[in-house]
Amino acid sequence: MRFLRHIAVVVALAVLAVGSTIVNAQSADLPDSAPIATIGAGSTVSVNADILLPANQGTIYLQAGSVTTWEQIDKKAPSCRLNAVESPVVRRLVPGRKLVITGTTQNNGSVFFYGDVLQFEEDATVSQFQCSPGHKGAMNIGELKQVFGGMFSLIQAPAVVGE
C-alpha cells in the first residue's frame, strides 16, 4: 500500500516538472533575430524617457535611442517613426507609460521605406511605430531595440499556444 503512495507522489512530481517546463517555454521572449512581425499582441512598449510630442506634428523620427529628423536619419541603419495623433498642443510621453501592441504588419522588401509596423491599442496620443531596418527585408527585434536605445523598452507578452 505504501508503495502505491510513493508511486503516486513520484508521478505527481513528474507531471509538475513537465508542466513547469512547458509554461517556461511558452513565456520565453522571442530572440533578437526574430522579425518584429512575430511580436505578440498584448506585448507593450514602455516609455523610459520624457519625450515631447510637438504641436501640429504627427511624426517623430527615432534612431539609435534619440529623436531626430528625416534629414538626419542614416537611411542604411535601423530607424522608426512614431505616428502621433495630430494636436494643436504640445504633449509628452512620460516614463512608465505603456503602449499596448495590438498587432503588427509587414511590407517586406518593398519600396515603402517604413514597412514594418507596430500597431497600438487605441490611444489619444500615439497610434503606431513604423520601422525600417535600413536594408531590404524585415526588421528584427534586435534592430528595434537598437532604435529604442534607452528611450523605450519592449516587454513581450507570454506566447499563447493552442488557442
Task: Label the model's feature ranges.
Residues M1-V11:
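Bacterial N-terminal signal peptides that target proteins for export
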Residues V9-G19:
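Bacterial N-terminal signal peptides
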Residues T21-A25:
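Sec/Tat signal peptide C-region and signal peptidase I cleavage site
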Residues Q26-G103:
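N-terminal secretory signal peptides
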Residues S46, I51-L62, E121-P133, G137-M139:
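Solvent-exposed hydroxyl-ligand-binding patches built from regularly spaced Ser/Thr
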Residues A49, G103-N108, F148-Q156:
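Sec/Tat-exported extracytoplasmic proteins
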Residues I101-A124:
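SH3/SH3-like beta-barrel superfamily modules
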Residues D123-E163:
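C-terminal partner/receptor-binding element of secreted or periplasmic proteins
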